[in-house]
Structure formats: structure tokens, C-alpha cells
């Protein structure tokens, strides 16, 4: 990656940030994302397209730690190429209802061999007893001390060919709680809830399950626009990303904080500290963090894909 200095364009952007009520930390994050300090470790120039993200909030590129989430639909993945591209973590689909993802074992072993921090997720099937679902997940996703916390993918499934059951808010919260508690008991780590805008608004916006970190989907707006003041750990900002080593599209995600906070999360994953706010600017990075971190590529949401 070529070294970059502070251009007039960067200075103009920083002046605009300073004039907005986002605080000094946002300016620091903007400097971080601009690559001040001589560039970062990525082998190729990474380009973001922010035209789909509106408002004065931070853009995906303003966060230094980026990752992907994958399933069988990504096919055969060259995990060494993924690692060399700068991807910092991978979420790997293990199960959906009572079925194992066909590529889970290969993806798990590949990410591990490539040195990419990785964790498994379960996609909820609302027509099966919740405890039974998680027991199937536990039979497939191994317990490993260095794995990322497990994720429960809780979203509405109105188009499912086999499960059209519309869960009530009480059912959704109760079943989700059962699954999260069993995950935590088995893996000895606080699990993470993945949620979409519609599921969150219908079931979690009233303050339910705030003891658990959340991973939010929002491909058009910053999470603060759609999820309010709820602090988030991970933001799925794109569903048609491109990453070396993966032949087609892939979901791309950002971690909420600095490299230092990411390293702390890897050591002790858990509920995000309240003082960091709702997905807003993280504390200002150090000079070494600024020099070391560069984000991933981003392109616009594809035509016909749901934008939230």
C-alpha cells in the first residue's frame, strides 16, 4: 500500500467533521481511516463508496477493524488470500435450525489455519424447540478457547418455505433468551445477538436482552439511525462485498472501536462498556494504531437487495 500524506481533501473533510457535533474522537478516527502516518499493512489500495450512507455519522471506512461472515454460499474459500487482504475476523455459519452448513467444517479449519480470528453462528428456525436448536449447534461448532463468541442470528423468516410461523414479541424474547443462556453455558463466553432492523424494532427496541452484545445489519444508514442509542459491537454494512480469496459476494462487517479495543475484545469478549456510546466514535487512537490500521473495500448495495 502506498504511503499517503494529509491532502487538501483530507483537511477539508476534517474541517467539516470539526464543525459537526461529533467530538474530537471522530476527527481522530477520520485521521486513522485516511491513512496518516505512512499507510498500513494491506497489500492493495482499499476503496470505500460512502454514497449509500447518509447523515453526519461515521462511515464504514472510519472504523479500522473489518471482517466478513460466510456460509456455504461463498463456496470454496482461499483463506490465506482472505487473511492477506487485511480481513481481521470471520463469522462462519455452522447451523440453521437442525441442519449443518455444508461448508462449515472447511471454513472453520481454513480460517483457523490462516490465523484469522473466527467464530460460529446459528441461524434461528422458529419452528423448532429453541433448546433443541442450540444443542444441534453445539454438536457442530467446537468449543475452542481462542474462538470468537458464538452468535445467534435472530431475524424474521417470512419467506421460509418450511417455517412461516410469525413469532410474537414474547415468544421471540423468551426463545432467544433460552438459546443465549444455553450458548453461554456451553461455550463459557457471552454470546452475541445478530439482528436486522425489522426484528430489532419488533422485539428488541424496548430494551430487551441488553445484557448481550449485538451485531446489527444496516446497509444504508449508520446503526445509530436505525438502532437508536443501543450500543453495538459489530455492524454488517454490506452484503455484496468483494474480498480476495472469495469468488463471489460476501457480507462485510466493522467492529465498533480501535485496534486496542479489538485486542481487548479478543482477550475478554463480553458486553461493550457503556461509556463508548451507541456505535459512535471510539476513544482517540494512539499513533501506533493510526499507522497500523487500514479498513476494507466497500461497494454499494446491489440492485434488488434489501437496504436498511
Regions found by a protein language model. Give the residues of each.
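Substrate-binding cleft of extracellular glycoside hydrolase catalytic domains
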Residues: 60-76, 92-180, 184-186
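Short loop/helix-cap segments at secondary-structure boundaries that form the rim of catalytic
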Residues: 77-84, 202-209, 223-231
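Functionally critical loop-and-helix segments that line ligand-binding/catalytic clefts
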Residues: 40-70, 209-308
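C-terminal motif of bacterial Sec signal peptides marking the signal peptidase cleavage site
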Residues: 32-35
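Hydrophobic anchor at the start of a short beta-strand
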Residues: 118, 189-191, 214
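Aromatic-lined carbohydrate-recognition surfaces of secreted/lumenal glycan-active proteins
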Residues: 188-201
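Bacterial N-terminal signal peptides that target proteins for export
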Residues: 4-23
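Conserved beta-strand positions
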Residues: 70, 92, 152-154, 193-196, ...
Amino acid at each position: 500500500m502506498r504511503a499517503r500524506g494529509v491532502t487538501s481533501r483530507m483537511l477539508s473533510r476534517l474541517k467539516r467533521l470539526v464543525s459537526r457535533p461529533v467530538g474530537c474522537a471522530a476527527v481522530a478516527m477520520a485521521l486513522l481511516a485516511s491513512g496518516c502516518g505512512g499507510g498500513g499493512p494491506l497489500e492493495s489500495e482499499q476503496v470505500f463508496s460512502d454514497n449509500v450512507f447518509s447523515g453526519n455519522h461515521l462511515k464504514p471506512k472510519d472504523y479500522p477493524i473489518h471482517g466478513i461472515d460466510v456460509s456455504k454460499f461463498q463456496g470454496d474459500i482461499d483463506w490465506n488470500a482472505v487473511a492477506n487482504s487485511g480481513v481481521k475476523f470471520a463469522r462462519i455459519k455452522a447451523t440453521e435450525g437442525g441442519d449443518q452448513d455444508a461448508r462449515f467444517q472447511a471454513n472453520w479449519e481454513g480460517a483457523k489455519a490462516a490465523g484469522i480470528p473466527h467464530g460460529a453462528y446459528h441461524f434461528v428456525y422458529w419452528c423448532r424447540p429453541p433448546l433443541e436448536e442450540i444443542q444441534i449447534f453445539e454438536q457442530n461448532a467446537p468449543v475452542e478457547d481462542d474462538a470468537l463468541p458464538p452468535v445467534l442470528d435472530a431475524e424474521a423468516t417470512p419467506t421460509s418455505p418450511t417455517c412461516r410461523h410469525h413469532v410474537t414479541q414474547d415468544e421471540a424474547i423468551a426463545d432467544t433468551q433460552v438459546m443465549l443462556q444455553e450458548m453461554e453455558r456451553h461455550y463459557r463466553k457471552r454470546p452475541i445477538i445478530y439482528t436486522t432492523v425489522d426484528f430489532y424494532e419488533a422485539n428488541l427496541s424496548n430494551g430487551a436482552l441488553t445484557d448481550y452484545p449485538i451485531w446489527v445489519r444496516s446497509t444504508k444508514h449508520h446503526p445509530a439511525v436505525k438502532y437508536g442509542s443501543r450500543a453495538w459491537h459489530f455492524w454488517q454494512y454490506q452484503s455484496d462485498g468483494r474480498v480476495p480469496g472469495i469468488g463471489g459476494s460476501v457480507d462485510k462487517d466493522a467492529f465498533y472501536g480501535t485496534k486496542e479495543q479489538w485486542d481487548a475484545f479478543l482477550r475478554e469478549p463480553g458486553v461493550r462498556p457503556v461509556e463508548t456510546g451507541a456505535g459512535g466514535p471510539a476513544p482517540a487512537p494512539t499513533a501506533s494504531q493510526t499507522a497500523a490500521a487500514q479498513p476494507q473495500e466497500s461497494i454499494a448495495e446491489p440492485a434488488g437487495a434489501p437496504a436498511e
